[in-house]
Design a protein with these regions (language model features):
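Bacterial extracytoplasmic/cell-wall-associated proteins, especially those involved in peptidoglycan
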Residues: 88-89, 104-286
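Signal peptide-directed extracytoplasmic domains
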Residues: 1-146
Length: 286
């Protein structure tokens, strides 16, 4: 506690908020709530008393939101908007940062598109950061994660595409490896019932720029490369930023012959898996 109080005091002295580190440390140490001060950037006046400065740090309304949070399944368009909002930059500046694939460290197998390569998590933005430095951290996080999980560079993009679909279709951990198996089975089933088509709503929605909901008929009829009801195989890129759980599910899918699944209880998320369309129709009736 003493060192953290001293560190904060020194920062405040350097910024002209308080005159004396010692006075701030004394105030810090006799205030039990001091330990709840969160890291971050705060708006404080200059030339405050030690007690006033400490009170200012304990008031969350003075904390400037400098965190960019990426959640599993979030689209790159949503991440871009967050960068614009938090960093106070323009959309054009963010687009330019994403376009400089070398500067953000985007591997060549991504094909120039960072969708799926922005590791979910919280990123604290400092005054020294630019859109490029922040995006580079997100990309490096994904590269490091894939390396840690033993994914060969040649397989990275395919794994991220599949994992992003798993996340798009399923948010209950126990079913993720089963959904991953459905993807594998459908890709292999080129001459069977599903004719190699994934038929996944999450990809259809992505193709028409929707982030959630259920596709309507116009969405299902929209002929774009992400419409896996019209096109066999995988979509050209991931459809969001995949979670580590989804990536692990893709790397180790459950054993099974399923080609279909349907959630039968929206409250519990209970999902039934089927190997034939006939079986799927029976499950749908539940």
């Amino acid at each position: 506690p003493i060192s953290s109080g001293r560190d904060i005091g020194q920062t405040l002295v350097d910024a002209g908020v308080v005159k004396s580190v010692g006075a701030f440390v004394r105030q810090f140490e006799k205030t039990a709530a001091s330990m709840s001060i969160r890291p971050g950037t705060y708006r404080l006046k200059q030339q405050m008393s030690a007690a006033g400065a400490l009170a200012g740090l304990l008031d969350e309304t003075n904390r400037v939101d400098s965190t960019i949070t990426i959640t599993s399944g979030q689209k790159m368009s949503e991440v871009k908007k967050r960068i614009v909002d938090i960093m106070g930059v323009t959309e054009e500046q963010v687009d330019a940062a994403f376009a400089d694939t070398e500067a953000i460290g985007l591997p060549s197998e991504a094909g120039g598109n960072a969708e799926g390569w922005l590791l979910p998590g919280s990123y604290e933005v400092s005054e020294d950061d630019t859109p490029t430095t922040v995006i580079a951290r997100m990309v490096k996080g994904t590269v490091d994660e894939l390396d840690r999980l033993g994914v060969a560079p040649a397989d990275r993009q395919t794994v991220l595409i599949k994992a992003s679909i798993v996340d798009g279709e399923m948010n209950i951990d126990k079913y993720m490896p089963m959904v991953a198996r459905v993807i594998e089975n459908r890709l292999a089933d080129t001459n069977g019932e599903t004719k190699g088509m994934l038929g996944m709503d999450s990809t259809v929605l992505y193709g028409v720029g929707k982030t959630s909901g259920v596709p309507d008929q116009a969405d299902l009829d929209n002929d774009n490369p992400y419409n896996t009801r019209l096109h066999a195989g995988l979509p050209p890129t991931p459809i969001g930023q995949p979670s580590e759980k989804a990536i692990k599910a893709v790397l180790n899918p459950a054993e099974g012959t399923w080609l279909y699944f349907v959630t039968v209880n929206l409250d519990t998320g209970e999902t039934l898996f089927a190997s034939t369309l006939e079986e799927q129709e029976k499950n749908r009736e539940q």
